[in-house]
Amino acid sequence: MTDKELGIHTEEVQIDGTDSFHCHRYEPTSYEVLEELFYHYTPMENDVIVDYGCGLGRLNFYVENRFSLMSTGVELTDRYYTRALRNRETYLGDKEKITFVQCAAQNYEVSPNETVFYFFNPFSISIFRQVINRILLSWQEHPRVLTLILYYPEDDVVFYIEQHTSFALFGEFASGEEVKCDRRERFCLYRLDI
């Protein structure tokens, strides 16, 4: 799969220096890495995916194209949010299944139908905790099976999930050969049951 096949433009890595301790730089998950993820993990047909720090929306377009899933991309930066909306306009698939929301991740109101939450090292542990707390609050109000997908996770994020939440690890695998040089080049998948 490529941007051209989808009618979108997501090939960009943030190099402007505006990333910070709390919000890490934008970099899309490569199509090869997405293929690896979905080789090991198959979402349910009624899953709704939320991509926190979605940038230009690559994951959202990918899951709609491959699985016909609904998704929401949460993006703080105006520039990326605007370009994600532009990508939605030019996308060759079902635009109606893709939503973008501009807000801070910790302020995003999790909908009762959202079940899978994707994180590509988007922000600091202090913000991550707040996001997870909102997800857990939604789960308490509307019990359902939830899945967290962490790509390129920092140690403090993994520790927090495993020691301070009820999510249980159900899958961990390398995202490619790069894991030999950087152990963060992996996926950690967690589930919270009813």
Regions found by a protein language model. Give the residues of each.
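A short SAM/SAH-binding and catalytic strip from SAM-dependent methyltransferases
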Residues: 114-127
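S-adenosyl-L-methionine
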Residues: 1-44
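Glycine-rich SAM-binding Motif I of class I
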Residues: 57-61
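Conserved class I S-adenosyl-L-methionine
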Residues: 46-55
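Conserved SAM-binding strand-loop segment of SAM-dependent methyltransferases
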Residues: 94-103
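C-terminal substrate-binding/active-site "lid" region of AdoMet-derived donor-dependent transferases
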Residues: 126-188
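Conserved SAM-binding loop
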Residues: 84-85
